[in-house]
Amino acid sequence: GASCARALHAEGLAVTLVEPDSAYFACPFSNAVIAGLRDMEAQRFTLDGLRRAGIAVVPRRAVAVEPRRVVLADGAALAWDRLVLAPGIELRFDALPGYDEAAAEVMPHAWRAGPQTALLRRQLEAMADGGTVVMAVPANPYRCPPGPYERACLIAHYLKTRKPRSKLIVLDAKDQFSKQRLFEQAWARLYPGIIEHVPLSGGGRVTGADAATRTLTTEFGTHRADVANVIPPQRAGAIAAAAG
């Protein structure tokens, strides 16, 4: 949304950005934070640069879209000639039995950068050498298709360099994934014996979660984790549905 606002403003258009948060943590490079290669604060950005560029920033949440009007959470409305929706994602906590927002505080998704990113990093740091990390990767569609496999590489790097007796199991609800050949080559060359990828055809689809025991259930059995990273199914943010 911010990039679109900048590009349109550069063409001389009057642009208003509606955004409830005064700052945000960027997802790109957040996997490096999880692996201890980047500081969390480096991911934090404010909207001050947009304001300095002359873009009007309205610190509210948009809740409805009407013909030529956007309705805000406080009841105010903004008129528009052209409307761009940048809804982001909504995590579907109703899609995986046993995995809700409370469970995410034990088995973080870290698919929205910020506190969840820091939580997953702390859990990896606290895990004993020889522990097992289990990732659950959803079926398509979801934000950033290669992201889980990039994360697998970086977690494996952390384990290889800090906790070499540990392993990572990737439970995947797909048989094919983005940039698969490149990732598999990297796993074989850089992290042999560390990453075990379980595809859909091998029983990789996670069907349930138990936060109390950090256990993930698949159609073929269960996996007990010392650290569990559960990436749930997703959909477009609520404003997309509200807009019709």
Q: Residues of each region from the PLM?
A:
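A conserved beta-strand/loop capping segment in the N-terminal third of enzymes
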Residues: 51-98, 131
